[in-house]
């Protein structure tokens, strides 16, 4: 019989990941040397990491209440990864947003971070989805 709390917690964790999977590729079609576009990209990743951290805390709390400590540790690690990734990622994406135009080096660095963020999100999403059959039927 499936564990409804574990499936609920997993679904909460998957939603922000799925959002970024759909939203981030749109930035591949635009140049990142335009300041408003770069700000929007930075804001999207900032919001993603914040929402993923909040979703991870909610999921961890829900699983802890059911007494499934192994799963709670997994959710807690995913939450900690999101919180630390946000800081690391945004520190590298910072630039002078008051500039009229962004130079090519900064745009290239942002493009690499964009690809890296999309890849990391896809790997995490695939890992969480691959674990659903094991999460939903694991004993307490």
Regions of interest found by a model, annotated:
Residues 1-140:
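Polytopic transmembrane helical bundles with strong interfacial aromatic enrichment
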């Amino acid at each position: 019989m499936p564990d409804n709390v574990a499936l609920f917690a997993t679904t909460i964790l998957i939603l922000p990941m799925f959002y970024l999977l759909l939203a981030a590729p749109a930035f591949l079609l635009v140049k990142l040397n335009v300041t408003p576009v770069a700000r929007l990209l930075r804001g999207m990743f900032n919001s993603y990491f914040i929402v993923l951290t909040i979703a991870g805390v909610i999921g961890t709390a829900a699983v802890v209440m059911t007494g499934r400590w192994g799963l709670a540790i997994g959710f807690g690690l995913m939450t900690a990864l999101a919180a630390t990734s946000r800081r690391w990622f945004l520190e590298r994406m910072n630039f002078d947003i008051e500039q009229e135009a962004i130079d090519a080096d900064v745009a290239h660095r942002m493009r690499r971070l964009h690809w890296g963020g999309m890849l990391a999100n896809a790997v995490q999403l695939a890992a969480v989805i691959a674990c659903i059959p094991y999460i939903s039927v694991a004993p307490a």
